């Protein structure tokens, strides 16, 4: 069981077979959180079991698996291409339909670029599975509501709420005002820097001044329904999970949190369940056979279903 929030203030076979703030200085903790924020007397946010959260990463309109640390922000593009682990011949909508058929909710569609092809593909996925997918990539106050209207359950934001490496609280509050806390996911993806997990923005290329820790998660939980955290140092490399990061999330996140990065074998799912104290959901990308890897998607779905049985 996930403990309640206590603080006020991210292959063919499966298709065939399936039917802010600077670290330690929280300058706006003095400010009142939005009216929809949890309080000590609020009903607890409970998740009954660890879940597998599927993903659809879209780059130039195609479903791909990319080594996240090789992505470039468009305005800083030097002409080099990111390292691509896999490019699918299936559409984003086909993946969405697969996840819908298998009863997998809360997966994320990420647009790895601002091109119109990626946006069109993401909308096709949302239309194929209305209410079942979250969407991120270029989300801001001008377009966030439109994605909800197109069928997204939540919008995922990171770079928009940072400015020069610090959290822009006014932007964050605007998003809450427009779509509501209950439809907002904060992407707190991070990389290790000087022994701490620094939140990274702009396609994971820029370090913010914000380190992911208990106080930061406690505060930001007032403005979001969930967190999504990619372990960027291991993401897309199939080198194993960042167990230290998973443990940090499991111990300190007061709201549902999903970890992504480095899952290679089934044992990694159990390691996440254990290190995260049954509080951390998991996304698997490049390792899955539906994305060209060796880990059977059907086995991961079976593991997901077993988690629900275990707590029934």
From Swiss-Prot:
Its EC number is 5.3.1.16. Na(+) 2 binds at residues 159, 162. It is found in: Plastid, Chloroplast. Component of the histidine biosynthesis pathway that catalyzes the isomerization of 5'-ProFAR (pro-phosphoribosyl formimino-5-aminoimidazole-4-carboxamide ribonucleotide, referred as 1-(5-phospho-beta-D-ribosyl)-5-[(5-phospho-beta-D-ribosylamino)methylideneamino]imidazole-4-carboxamide) to PrFAR (phosphoribulosyl formimino-5-aminoimidazole-4-carboxamide ribonucleotide, referred as 5-[(5-phospho-1-deoxy-D-ribulos-1-ylimino)methylamino]-1-(5-phospho-beta-D-ribosyl)imidazole-4-carboxamide). NCBIfam families: hisA_euk. This is 1-(5-phosphoribosyl)-5-[(5-phosphoribosylamino)methylideneamino] imidazole-4-carboxamide isomerase HISN3, chloroplastic. Residues 1-67 form a transit peptide. One of its GO terms (molecular function) is 1-(5-phosphoribosyl)-5-[(5-phosphoribosylamino)methylideneamino]imidazole-4-carboxamide isomerase activity. InterPro entries: Aldolase_TIM, His6-like_euk, His_biosynth, Isoase_HisA-like, RibuloseP-bd_barrel. It comes from Medicago truncatula. Its cofactor is Na(+). Keywords: Amino-acid biosynthesis, Chloroplast, Histidine biosynthesis, Isomerase, Metal-binding, Plastid, Sodium, Transit peptide. 5-[(5-phospho-1-deoxy-D-ribulos-1-ylimino)methylamino]-1-(5-phospho-beta-D-ribosyl)imidazole-4-carboxamide binds at residues 65, 108, 138, 158-159, 187, 204, 236, 262, 285-286. GO terms for biological process: L-histidine biosynthetic process. GO terms for cellular component: chloroplast; cytoplasm. Changing residue 57 to N: Lost catalytic activity. The lineage of its organism: Eukaryota, Viridiplantae, Streptophyta, Embryophyta, Tracheophyta. Belongs to the HisA/HisF family. Na(+) 1 binds at residues 65-66, 235. 1-(5-phospho-beta-D-ribosyl)-5-[(5-phospho-beta-D-ribosylamino)methylideneamino]imidazole-4-carboxamide binds at residues 57, 68, 138, 158-159, 187, 203-204, 230, 236, 262, 285-286. It catalyses: 1-(5-phospho-beta-D-ribosyl)-5-[(5-phospho-beta-D-ribosylamino)methylideneamino]imidazole-4-carboxamide = 5-[(5-phospho-1-deoxy-D-ribulos-1-ylimino)methylamino]-1-(5-phospho-beta-D-ribosyl)imidazole-4-carboxamide. Binds 2 sodium ions to optimize substrate binding. Pathway: Amino-acid biosynthesis; L-histidine biosynthesis; L-histidine from 5-phospho-alpha-D-ribose 1-diphosphate: step 4/9.
